[in-house]
Amino acid sequence: MQVISYFDSDRKPHWLEEIRRSDWRAGAFLSNLISKGSFVNSFGEKSKILLLTEGDELISFCTYTEKDNIQPTELTPWMGFVYTFPEHRGHRYIGKLFNEIERIAENDGFHAVYLSTNHVGLYEKYGCEFLTQMNDMDGKSSRIYIKRIY
């Protein structure tokens, strides 16, 4: 398995189609942002889309962004759009992407990464800790987690 950056890939059309295959509304939203060329404008210049691949197959994806749907906030950077295809769940593959996000964040001078979700018990097994509740841009309450980088 290999972690690649969508924007650094020479196979963007293929990986965009793979993201579109996800059965998740946020995956469709992400692919739409990519198609429109508005991902970076929405989430910040240093934002990345990370893909865990096995040959031509997309196993998992997630993002590393300066901003998230929790605004306004001083918290940065964020990991989001966390998804693993159903046939690959249960193997903790997303941890490989989280490790890459931690490496990038540390290289960018950060000591923590944040995550907005309503899942309970999923991200804790990757070392994320509940931080607080905040409202997203639609006014809906979201759990904010912090992943400290040591």
Model-derived regions, located:
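Conserved acetyl-CoA-binding loop-helix of GNAT-fold acetyltransferases
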Residues: 81-84, 90-103, 115
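Short loop/turn motifs at secondary-structure junctions and domain boundaries
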Residues: 40-45
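Conserved beta-strand in the GNAT
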Residues: 51, 57-67, 78, 83
